[in-house]
């Protein structure tokens, strides 16, 4: 894929850097690698002079951004098709701005009805935090629902500060290229990594170290793990938990009432965030926080934090820069270790090759046979591959699912040390 580098000076936002290269807006058919969080990619699209559909991975960022302007529409589980139809008909909004979850996208398509093809011709489609397609598709297949529609838009782009490599052929077929933002200053942040065999003791010691901090933000992708920490450290009266509504329900059943599903101020002294808050959302504070990232592999593998994406995204949630030009006091990641038995890259290559051979054989036999019983049997066998998230809902090869397996290989094996 062709790569174009664009310099970003210290006093510039993304749109300034783009304009220096002759782009008035985010161009079409690009994967925009911002390098830095918080430089205004979504902001640029929301304020562009064109109609836009912006796909965000989770609800909190959608609700937060749409609340800033009554001319922007948030589409998620609570939004009805009728509300979207009403918005599309508004004549007082010159440039429509629709922010939607991947799951909410089908409501936009349904609301547009016969005008949907016109929307694909005239709206710019921006898929924000695009690495989530690869990272989340194994447990959240619905995140891929808009993918086919996305590539049917005349103008579209992927964007993230931490994009992953994507193998879907459509990128090459449609001539996608990468725009790489290159900051002209040292933007690195110090992170204190603590690898321990005594997770509970180390976490307790870290909380003791942070007892005088005005605000501690803890990122741990386990509602159960958060609940255990709150109880064992007796933080009930001075903590808040930010998680999904489902997670909040579990906490309520456990007797914890101070859990919310979107950013809500003021924050407490101790604030816990699950993975839906790792990217995209803005956390605005009047005090400089201490950030603590926790990975407990003995509790759950899904508490693993990807150092190439999630760790970068987490520290980027904090937008306010204080007098010392910093956005936080400290950034610490505590993790234990465990042999996860993951495949090596070489082993995974062989496994994927076998899947593809099996798929090709089954699909050819399925297309050739006219016997309904045989078709049913072959379709069931294809669905078995689909259950391993290597086929999508149309029974085509799911390249994001394959990319997910390679990303896990990098994350969970010693191969990561070679990258």
PLM region spans:
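Conserved small/polar residues in nucleotide/adenosyl-binding loops
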Residues: 412-419
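Conserved strand-helix element at the start of the C-terminal RecA-like helicase core
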Residues: 52-62, 210-231
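Conserved helicase ATPase motor motifs in RecA-like P-loop NTPase domains
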Residues: 33-39, 131, 147-169
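Interdomain hinge/linker at the junction between the two RecA-like core domains of SF2 helicases
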Residues: 169-203
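Conserved SF2 helicase motif VI
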Residues: 299-322
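SF2 helicase catalytic motif II
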Residues: 117-144
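Inter-Walker segment of RecA-like/P-loop motor cores
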Residues: 72-109
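SF2 helicase motor core recognition
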Residues: 38-43, 106-111, 271-289, 313-317
């Amino acid at each position: 894929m062709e790569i174009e580098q664009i310099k970003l000076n210290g006093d510039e936002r993304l749109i300034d850097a783009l304009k220096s290269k002759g782009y008035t807006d985010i161009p079409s058919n690009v994967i925009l690698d911002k390098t830095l969080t918080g430089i205004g990619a979504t902001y640029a699209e929301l304020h562009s002079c064109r109609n836009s559909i912006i796909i965000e991975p989770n609800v909190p960022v959608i609700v937060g951004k749409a609340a800033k302007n009554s001319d922007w529409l948030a589409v998620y589980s609570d939004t009805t098709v009728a509300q979207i139809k009403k918005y599309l008909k508004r004549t007082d909004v010159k440039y429509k701005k629709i922010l939607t979850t991947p799951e909410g996208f089908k409501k936009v398509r349904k609301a547009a009805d016969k005008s949907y093809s016109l929307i694909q011709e005239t709206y710019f489609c921006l898929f924000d935090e695009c690495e989530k397609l690869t990272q989340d598709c194994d447990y959240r297949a619905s995140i891929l629902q808009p993918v086919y529609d996305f590539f049917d838009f005349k103008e579209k782009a992927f964007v993230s500060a931490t994009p992953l490599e994507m193998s879907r052929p459509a990128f090459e077929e449609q001539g996608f290229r990468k725009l790489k933002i290159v900051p002209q200053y040292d933007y690195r942040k110090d992170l204190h990594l603590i690898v321990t065999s005594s997770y509970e003791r180390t976490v307790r010691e870290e909380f003791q170290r942070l007892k005088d901090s005005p605000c501690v933000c803890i990122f741990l992708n386990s509602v159960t793990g958060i609940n255990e920490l709150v109880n064992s450290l007796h933080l009930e009266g001075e903590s808040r938990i930010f998680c999904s509504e489902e997670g909040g329900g579990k906490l309520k059943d456990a007797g914890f009432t101070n859990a919310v599903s979107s950013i809500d101020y003021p924050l407490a002294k101790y604030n816990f965030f699950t993975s839906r808050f790792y990217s995209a959302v803005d956390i605005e504070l009047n005090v400089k926080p201490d950030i603590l990232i926790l990975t407990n592999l003995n509790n759950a593998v899904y508490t693993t934090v990807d150092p190439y994406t999630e760790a970068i995204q987490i520290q980027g949630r904090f937008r306010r820069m204080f007098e010392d030009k910093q956005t936080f006091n400290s950034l610490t990641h505590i993790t234990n270790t465990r042999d996860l038995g993951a495949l090596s890259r070489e082993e995974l290559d062989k496994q994927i090759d076998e899947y593809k051979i099996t798929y090709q054989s089954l699909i050819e036999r399925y297309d050739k046979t006219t016997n309904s019983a045989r078709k049913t049997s072959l379709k069931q066998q294809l669905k078995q591959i689909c259950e391993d998230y290597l086929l999508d809902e149309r029974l085509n090869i799911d390249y994001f699912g394959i990319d997910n397996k390679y990303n896990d290989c990098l994350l969970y094996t010693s191969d990561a040390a070679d990258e």
